[in-house]
Structure formats: C-alpha cells, structure tokens
A protein has these predicted regions:
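N-proximal low-complexity "stem/linker" segments adjacent to membrane-targeting elements
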Residues: 1-21
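Short, charged/polar "capping" segments at the starts of alpha-helices
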Residues: 14-16, 39-45, 129
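Short, acidic, metal-binding catalytic loop of nucleotide-sugar glycosyltransferases
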Residues: 21-30
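Active-site-proximal specificity loops/subdomain of glycosyltransferases
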Residues: 35-93
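Conserved glycosyltransferase catalytic-site signature
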Residues: 79-86, 103-105, 189-197
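Short beta-strand-to-loop acidic/aromatic patch adjacent to the donor-nucleotide binding site
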Residues: 95-106
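Conserved catalytic core of nucleotide-sugar-dependent glycosyltransferases
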Residues: 107-184, 189, 197
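Catalytic donor-sugar/metal-binding loop of nucleotide-sugar-dependent glycosyltransferases
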Residues: 197-209
Length: 209
C-alpha cells in the first residue's frame, strides 16, 4: 500500500506547517501535494517539507447558513473544480490511497491503510443521509449503501485509483444531478464530507471508519 496526501490551504501558514510537520515525522518521503486555494504563497513551506506545490488563483471556500448569498457550502461549479484538483493530486501522487489533509489535522503515528479500503472517514450515525436522497441514487444509479450517514472530513482516506478510474463517469453525474439534488434532496451536498461519499458510493464502494 502506498499513500499520498492532498492538502488544500489558504492563509494559515503556521497551522499548515504544523500539519505537514506531523505527517513528515512518520512519512518523510511520501508524495504530498499542497494546493493553495487562492491565498498567499506557500512555496517556501512546500519546499521545506518536500511537497509538490500548486497555486490556484480561485478561492473555493465554504459558506455557512449566515452567508448573504444564501449559498450553503459550495456551488456545483466549485465542487467540480475541487474534484479536478483532487484528481490532479491523485495523479501527481501516483499512490494507491490518498489522505485528505487539513490544517487542523495532526498525525500521531505511522498510517497503515488496508489495501481493500476504498474510502474511510469518521463514524457519525447522527449525520444522516435522508432517504429521499439515498433512494434517488439507488433507483437511478443502482447505488448500494452500507451506511446511511456521512463523515469524510479532514483526515479521511480514499482509494486514489478508484477515484481516477471512475472520474469521467462520476463527474458527468455530478454535472447533471448536483443542483437538483442539492436543492431538493440533500441541502448539505456542498460540503466535502457529503459529496465524497456520494462519489464513492456511485463507484459501488463501501464506507469504512
């Protein structure tokens, strides 16, 4: 099993460095893709910790319920761009699995991922995926759900090869269905801990935690 890292950052260099440092303590040579989300340059930190650095001009970010736009999370266009960046990281790392790192994640030991794991996050039975949403994907795309909740936030691990192999097919579904699902079936689809389970369930995979 080989493991790479996808880490999107913005304007918190001190937190970013602590997160990278914690990973490098146990995995000094693993490929690590650092993507700046339209913020300040992280080139110096990237060079110091042997990361592959990509600077994107557009900031994706998130919006909470209080945002003046009325948008919750990300829009379809922003999610598609996020997935493009994730695909880039998977391609650059060229590993079996990829860790979705965030600034508030600290690694406390060497990471060993079972080869059969497809996507793994937190066990959060309280984060229910509503039946109209799950039923819709089951009836239209044959999705089989081994859990009815979501939880793939920072620190989650994904099978990178599965992501790449299914990208063109699943991206087409996201492009066609995202707005309808977000507006009618799953209002929090604009958050990564929801859209990534949707992606992998559309690949026919099971959630681990």
């Amino acid at each position: 099993m080989t493991l790479g890292v996808f880490h999107q950052v913005y304007t918190r260099p001190k937190a970013t460095e602590e997160a990278i440092k914690s990973f490098r303590q146990f995995h000094p040579d693993n490929p690590y893709v650092l993507i700046c989300d339209g913020g300040k340059s992280f080139h110096r930190i990237s060079k110091r910790y042997n990361c592959l650095y990509v600077h994107e001009e557009d900031n994706l970010g998130y919006r909470d319920h209080t945002h003046s736009s009325g948008i919750y999370g990300m829009t379809k266009e922003e999610v598609l761009e996020w997935l493009r960046r994730f695909r880039l990281a998977c391609t650059l790392c060229n590993t079996d699995h990829i860790l979705m790192m965030e600034d508030d994640i600290l690694i406390r030991g060497e990471i060993h991922v079972p080869e059969e794991w497809e996507f793994a996050g937190q066990a959060k039975p309280g984060n229910l995926l509503q039946e109209p949403f799950t039923d819709y994907l089951t009836e239209k795309y044959g999705v089989e759900w081994n859990v009815n909740y979501y939880g793939t936030g920072g620190g989650s691990i994904f099978n990178a090869k599965t992501f790449l192999e299914n990208y063109e097919r699943v991206i087409k579904i996201f492009d066609e269905e995202f707005d309808y699902i977000k507006e009618n079936l799953c209002g929090n689809l604009g958050w990564v801990d929801v859209w990534m389970p949707m992606y992998y369930f559309l690949c026919g995979k099971q959630y681990r935690h």
